Regions:
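Conserved donor-binding/catalytic core segment of Leloir-type glycosyltransferases
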Residues: 232-257, 263-266
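Nucleotide-activated donor-binding/catalytic signature segment of Leloir-type glycosyltransferases, i.e.
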Residues: 273-278, 283-310, 315-318
Length: 421
């Protein structure tokens, strides 16, 4: 079987969750004998592994002015005329099935989906809500996407729009998907439910949770992990991951990742806990985070090494996932695989991963004070936290191995190919 993945890039120095998930899936599929390539806007790896989406050829001079026009009216992606030339590629012709991942970001024209899926069996893997909203990847508390969008309350949410044309974009997406042949894969039951409430409900929707390499993400002795990071063995250690704590567009703490809520929660810890607390940050901005929280921060910068991530997760007593929206919660799963319980919010699919009382706790509200309360409960009960640590690892190994995910995807691919025969 040959799979052609579609993503903005094949690899990147600071990889987001969707790209990390796709790369791990490709690796595990290869171990199952499945060949694959990536079709992308920016290729950073070898040509044998990835090809770039073709340009618009004779129409290339139209793309720049078309982009200016479409951006001005609030449409982000429909200027990419080269997307319609993808069927000319050898990689497309050789593929048995297409798998679309994270096709927003201005590199792919979703209006080409009907023609692309007419020629090939295709799967759409959901990493966020973008395919069925009027522009955003995370609708937060807005449910207008169920009715057609318009009057958008969050026009600056990623990917932002300069003008509210969200009803028009919603209709264009509905038109494009309505004329396409697809199977849909969702990583959480919450995402399955959301997709079924959208215009994607015309397609078969498969539940395939993300996987993790449990041989790499495995518990490291806390004393060893803390020594490696220069942390005193008797400290209370909290873990957090965010590429950068400040939103580069605004210069304030990243609200999408809940950095403002993390700051409030850690700042308000009781004195008897706070005096002995250290925060491990996988991401940029450790010094600033220390100033804002009032606790020492071990800032690791962006961590690309999975083994280094495993050390960071293992050093923590509790990992905090403060995001205001999660389609799944990949970093939570990585932490669990290392035997570290997770505290987060009841947002998206995160609660399914954490399983409150089993592998961590969910705060009672999306507030810094509620997050603080949940963290305190975890830190003050060593016996309960130790039980959760064992359960975290058991869940990761028994349900989320990469081989399990690969076999599930292979079945989706086979079912999709058979349905198109």
């Amino acid at each position: 079987m040959k799979v052609l993945f579609v993503h903005s890039t094949d690899q990147h120095a600071t990889e987001a969750g969707g790209l990390i998930s796709m790369r791990r899936l490709r690796r595990s599929l290869k171990e199952q004998g499945v060949e694959s390539q990536v079709l992308c806007a920016t290729r950073n790896g070898p040509a044998a592994e990835a090809q770039t989406i073709p340009g618009a050829s004779g129409l290339s001079r139209l793309e720049a002015p078309l982009r200016r026009i479409t951006r001005q009216i609030g449409l982000n992606d429909v200027h990419r005329l080269g997307t319609f030339r993808i069927p000319q590629l050898e990689a497309f012709r050789r593929a048995d099935v297409l798998d679309f991942h994270c096709i927003h970001g201005g590199f792919f024209n979703y209006l080409a989906l009907p023609s692309l899926t007419k020629h090939k069996p295709a799967v759409l893997t959901l990493h966020d809500m973008w395919p069925f909203t009027g522009h955003c990847a995370n609708s937060q508390d807005c449910e207008r996407w169920t009715q057609g969008c318009g009057r958008c309350p969050y026009p600056n949410a990623y990917p932002s729009v300069s003008r509210d044309a969200t009803h028009l974009e919603w209709r264009l997406k509905s038109w494009a998907f309505g004329r396409s042949r697809l199977s849909v894969v969702a990583p959480s039951k919450w995402m399955v439910t959301s997709a079924r409430q959208s215009f994607l409900n015309r397609f078969p929707i498969f539940y395939v949770p993300h996987g993790v390499d449990t041989n790499v993400f495995r518990p490291v002795g806390k004393a060893v992990a803390r020594a490696a990071l220069g942390i005193a063995p008797n400290s209370r250690v909290l873990g957090f991951a965010c590429t950068r704590i400040d939103d580069p567009r605004t210069g304030v703490p990243n609200k999408a990742k809940g950095v403002d809520l993390l700051i409030e929660a850690v700042r308000d810890l009781p004195d008897h806990l706070k005096a002995n607390t250290v925060l491990v940050l996988m991401g940029q901005g450790g010094e600033r985070l220390a100033e804002l929280t009032g606790v020492p921060v071990v800032g690791l910068g962006y961590v690309s090494s999975d083994r280094m991530k495993a050390i960071a997760y293992s050093a923590a007593d509790v990992f905090i996932s403060a995001s205001r929206g999660e389609s799944f919660g990949l970093v939570a799963l990585e932490s669990m695989s290392c035997g570290t319980p997770v505290v987060g919010f009841d947002v998206g699919g995160l609660k399914e991963v954490i399983r409150p009382g089993v592998a961590g706790e969910v705060a009672t509200a999306v507030k810094g004070s509620a997050l603080c309360d949940a963290v305190v409960q975890m830190l003050e009960n060593d016996v309960r936290r130790g039980r959760m640590a064992r359960q975290c690892r058991e869940i990761a190994v028994s349900e989320h191995g990469l081989d399990i995910q690969a076999r599930r995807y292979m079945q989706v691919y086979l079912d999709t190919i058979a349905a198109c025969a």
